[in-house]
C-alpha cells in the first residue's frame, strides 16, 4: 500500500502542476512546517525523482515475495507492476536462479560491461525470456499467444492503471513523470544485479555454488536491503526468508552496496577496482573450465566497454 500511495501522491502533484494552482502557504504544521498549495516545476521534479528512488526500494520487497507462492507472489507481481516490470517475477525465478553466471542469464553482467549497458540489456533480456517462455507454454497448451493466460501480457496489463492515473492527472506530462519513475526504479534493480554477479562465470551445466555470487555483509547494506547482499545463501536456498539467510563466506567486493554503486556509476573506476577482485576470484574460486571460458570471452566483452 505504501508504494501505491506514493504513486497517487505523485499523480496529485502532477495534477496540481498542470492545473496551475497558485503556490502559496495555506497552513503550517506544529507552527514549523509550511504547507503549500500548488506545485512548482522544482517541486514536481523533486517529487518525481524521490518517488522513483522509493519505488526502487519497493522492488526489493517485490523480489523477496517473488520467491513465495499464492497471494504473496501476486503481491510481488503487483509491486513490480508499479515500476513496469511485472515480468521480473517469472524471469528471476525461472531464468536467473537456474542460469546464474551463464550467457543465458541476462541478469549476470559479463566482464567489461558498464552498469549503463547492463541496465537496458538485462531488462530487455529478462522480458524476452518471459515472452519466449509464455509462447512455448501456450503452444503446448494449444492456445494462442494473444491470450489472457499469457502471463507476460498480463504483467504489462497490470501496469495500465498507473499509466491511466498519470495520464488523467497531467496528460503526457503525467506519463513522462511515470516513465521517469520507472526508469529510476528499474535502474536501481539492475544495479543490484550488476553488483551481485558482475564478471562471475559459471560454465553451463556446472552446479551453482557460493562462489558464483558477490556477497555483501556490511551492516547498513543488510539493514537497508533486507539481507539481499547475502546472495550466495539466497541462491542456494531461494525460498528461504531474508531474515534466515546466513553469511556463508562467499567472495565479496569489500564495500557496501552504496559505495559499490557509486563506483559503478564511473565505469573506468569500477573496472579498475574490480579487476583485482576478479583476478583473485580466477585464482581461488574458478574451475579450469571457467578460466578457459573467461579467456575465450575476453575479446567478446571488450565491445561492451562502449555501452
Language-model-derived ranges and their functions:
Residues 305-307:
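Hydrophobic alpha-helical segments, chiefly the membrane-spanning helices
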Residues 5-23, 61:
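Transmembrane alpha-helix boundary signature
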Residues 45-158, 206-278:
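Membrane-embedded catalytic scaffold of the fatty acid hydroxylase/desaturase
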Residues 168-174:
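Transmembrane helix interruption/hinge and helix-loop junction motifs
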Residues 17-39:
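Membrane-interfacial helical/loop segments at transmembrane boundaries in membrane proteins
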Residues 294-301:
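Conserved small/polar residues in nucleotide/adenosyl-binding loops
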Residues 2-6, 154-163:
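Core segments of transmembrane alpha-helices
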Amino acid at each position: 500500500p505504501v508504494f501505491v500511495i506514493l504513486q497517487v501522491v505523485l499523480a496529485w502533484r502532477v495534477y496540481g502542476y498542470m492545473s496551475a494552482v497558485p503556490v502559496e502557504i495555506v497552513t503550517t504544521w506544529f507552527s514549523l512546517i509550511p504547507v503549500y498549495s500548488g506545485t512548482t516545476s522544482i517541486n514536481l521534479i523533486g517529487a518525481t525523482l524521490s518517488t522513483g528512488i522509493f519505488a526502487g526500494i519497493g522492488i526489493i520487497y517485490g523480489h523477496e515475495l517473488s520467491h513465495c507462492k499464492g497471494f504473496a507472489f501476486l503481491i510481488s507481481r503487483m509491486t513490480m507492476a508499479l515500476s513496469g516490470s511485472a515480468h521480473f517475477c517469472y524471469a528471476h525465478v525461472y531464468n536467473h536462479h537456474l542460469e546464474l553466471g551463464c550467457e543465458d542469464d541476462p541478469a549476470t553482467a559479463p566482464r567489461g560491461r558498464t552498469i549503463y549497458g547492463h541496465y537496458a540489456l538485462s531488462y530487455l533480456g529478462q522480458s524476452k525470456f518471459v515472452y519466449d517462455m509464455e509462447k512455448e507454454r501456450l503452444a503446448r497448451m494449444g492456445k494462442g499467444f494473444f491470450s489472457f493466460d499469457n502471463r507476460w501480457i498480463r504483467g504489462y496489463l497490470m501496469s495500465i492503471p498507473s499509466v491511466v492515473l498519470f495520464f488523467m492527472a497531467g496528460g503526457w506530462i503525467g506519463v513522462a513523470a511515470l516513465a521517469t519513475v520507472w526508469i529510476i526504479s528499474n535502474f536501481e534493480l539492475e544495479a543490484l544485479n550488476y553488483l551481485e554477479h558482475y564478471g562471475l562465470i559459471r560454465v553451463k551445466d556446472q552446479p551453482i555454488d557460493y562462489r558464483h555470487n558477490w556477497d555483501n555483509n556490511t551492516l547498513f547494506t543488510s539493514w537497508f536491503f533486507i539481507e539481499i547482499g547475502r546472495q550466495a545463501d539466497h541462491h542456494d536456498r531461494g525460498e528461504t526468508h531474508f531474515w534466515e539467510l546466513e553469511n556463508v563466506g562467499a567472495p565479496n567486493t569489500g564495500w557496501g552496496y552504496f559505495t559499490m554503486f557509486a563506483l559503478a556509476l564511473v565505469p573506468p573506476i569500477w573496472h579498475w577496482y574490480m579487476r583485482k577482485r576478479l583476478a583473485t576470484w580466477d585464482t581461488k574460486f574458478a574451475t579450469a573450465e571457467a578460466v578457459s571460458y573467461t579467456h575465450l570471452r575476453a575479446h567478446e566483452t571488450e565491445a561492451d566497454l562502449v555501452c
